[in-house]
Amino acid sequence: MSADNGLIIGIDLGTTNSCVSVMEGGRPVVLENPEGKRTTPSIVSYKNNEIIVGDAAKRQMVTNPNTIVSIKRLMGTSNKVKVQNADGTTKELSPEQVSAQILSYLKDFAEKKIGKKISRAVITVPAYFNDAERNATKTAGKIAGLNVERIINEPTAAALAYGIDKASREMKVLVYDLGGGTFDVSLLDIAEGTFEVLATAGDNRLGGDDWDNKIIEYISAYIAKEHQGLNLSKDKMAMQRLKEAAERAKIELSAQLETIISLPFLTVTQKGPVNVELKLTRAKFEELTKPLLERTRNPISDVIKEAKIKPEEINEILLVGGSTRMPAVQKLVESMVPGKKPNRSINPDEVVAIGAAIQGGVLRGDVKDVLLLDVTPLTLSIETLGGVATPLIKRNTTIPVSKSQIFSTAQDNQESVDVVVCQGERPMSRDNKSLGRFNLGGIQPAPKGKPQIEITFSLDANGILNVKAKDLTTQKENSITISDNGNLSEEEIQKMIRDAEANKERDNIIRERIELRNEGEGIVNTIKEILASPDAKNFPKEEKEKLEKLTGNIDAAIKANDYAKLKVEIENFKKWREEMAKKYNPTGEQGPQAK
C-alpha cells in the first residue's frame, strides 16, 4: 500500500447505513465494501472480544445482545452503551468509540480499494446536529485515525452532489432527506458555485425504520390472529427474520403493487411449526404508514415559510435517502411543490457521500469554483441585565461567521463579568437552552456602564462556537469553545421555534418591561452624574429641581413595578434632555447636556 498522498474521502456516517466516496479523475466514486455493497449498515457487534461491523453485525442484530444500532442518536451525549466481555464482565463504550469502529471499517476498506493510506476525511451530519454532536463526530474520526477536515450538513452535501454540474445558474432547491433513522428537509440557494442553506427543519426520530416497524406490527397481528394470540416479541431469532422480511417487503413495494411475505418455519409451538404466507399490497402498506408520511409534511411548509419564498419559486427537488424510493413519499413531495418532479438522477443512498467527496475535492483544490455555505439553526445570544437574551448571531445566519458587540457592567466598581451563552428564539435567557458560561476578571473599577467589554461569537465552518470576552481598557480577555450545547435534537429545536412563536406576545411584554427598567435605572444614574458634575453649578435652580423630581418619579415607578408610569417618566426625561440641548446648545456648540 502506497503512502498517504493527501487524498480526502467523503463519509456519510448515517444512523442506519453509511457510505464512503472519493474523487477519482475529477469525478466522485462510491467505494464498495468487502461484501460488494455500496452502503454499509451502521451497526457494530461485540462477540468473544471480536468487533464485527456492517452486514455481518446486522445479521446478528436481534440475536446478539451486544449489537449496537443507531449509535448516531447518542452522539454528543454522556450516555454510554454496555457490552459484555467474553469473561462475563461488562464494559462501557462512549458513542464516539462505537462510531469510530464504523469509521475505521470504512477507512480500512477504502484504503484497500484505493491502494493508498488515508488519513483525511469530510464527514456529513444532519443539519440540526449541534456543537456537541459535531464535536463528537470529529472525535470519532480522530479515534479512527482520521483528520476530519470538515463537517458538513447532509442536505448540503446532497445539493453539492447534484449541483456540481449546475453551478452556473441560480436555483432554489428543496432537499428532502428521509434516511433510515432521521428526516431532514432543507431549502438552498445555489448560484455561481455558491451553495447557501436558507432554512432547515426535520425530525430526528423519524426514518425508514419506522416504516419497517409498521410492517412488523402488521405481520405480528396476523400471526397472533392465526395462531391463538402467539406473541413473538421475545423470540429473538423470529424477530430477526421478521425485521428482514419487513425491510424486504418495503423495498419490493416501491417497485410493485403487491408482495408476498413468506416466512416458513418462523417458530415452533406445541402445535408444530408456524409458517407465514401473507400478501401485502402497496395500498395497505401506504394506509399503515400514512401517519408517518404526514409527519414529513409540516417541515416542508416550515422551510418554505422560513426562506420567505413561495412553493412555485422552487426550481428543483432533490430526494435523499433510500426511503424516498417509496411512491407515496414522492407523491407527497410533488403535492407540496406543484409542477415539480423530484430529481432522482443520483442514487439516494449514495448522494450524501458523493457530496462529501466533492467537498473533499474542494478542500484539496481538485474541484474549483464551489463555495459551501451552511447556516446556524438557532439564534446564539448572551444573557444581559434583567435576564434578557441579547442575540449576536441570529438563526439561519450563514457560517462561518464572527460577530462582536460592546457591553458594559451592571454595577458600580464591578471587577468581573459572567458571560452566559444561550441558544434559542425566546427573548429571555431562562427560556432558551444554556450552552455555557465563563468569567472575565480584572476589569478596572468604574461606574456601571462605563467599562467597554467586547463580546465576540465566532462560529466556524463546522458549526462549532467560540466565545471571547475582552476588556477594551485593560486588554484582558477570556474565552471558551462551546463543546456541549445541551444536545438538542431536531424535535427540540422545532419545539423551541414553535414556543417562541406561541409566547411571542407575552415574551415581548416581559422584555419591554425589563428594557424599561434598565433604561430607567440608567437614566437615574445619568441624572445623578449630571447633578454631581462641575457643569451642575451652571444650571438654574428650577432645572435642578426638575431633575430631582424626575429621579424621584422614575425611581418610584421602578420600585412599584409601574411600567406605564415608568414609560411616561422616561419620555419626560427625554423631552427635558431635548429642551436642554436646544436651550444651551442652539448652534451646535458644546454646552451642558445629559448623556
Curated annotation (Swiss-Prot):
One of its GO terms (biological process) is protein refolding. Belongs to the heat shock protein 70 family. It comes from Mycoplasma genitalium (strain ATCC 33530 / DSM 19775 / NCTC 10195 / G37). Acts as a chaperone. Induction: By stress conditions e.g. heat shock. This is Chaperone protein DnaK. SUPFAM superfamilies: Actin-like ATPase domain, Heat shock protein 70kD (HSP70), peptide-binding domain. One of its GO terms (molecular function) is heat shock protein binding. The gene is dnaK.
